[in-house]
Amino acid sequence: MPPPAAPTDCWLCARPLGVRIEWHHPIPKSRKGRETVPVHPICHRTIHKLFTNKELERNFHTPEKLAERPEMARFLQWIASKPPDFHAPTR
């Protein structure tokens, strides 16, 4: 059986992944989540900047749910045109 294919798109923003890939737990590990999904580093930092682990566990464990928050919707609109390895400080 061949190894699984490398991920190609970010779980959050759906842009192609670049060289650096981080793995996000949609349900945080501290809340017994085991599944991981590939994300850009900037997307990963933004998730954890905007949401607590409790919020991620209870209400925001899908990209669609995350995008319902206005701050995340603005981020997703802004990041959509950036290249895969785009990096900027997360404030």
Predicted feature descriptions by range:
Residues 6-38:
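Histidine-centered nuclease catalytic patch
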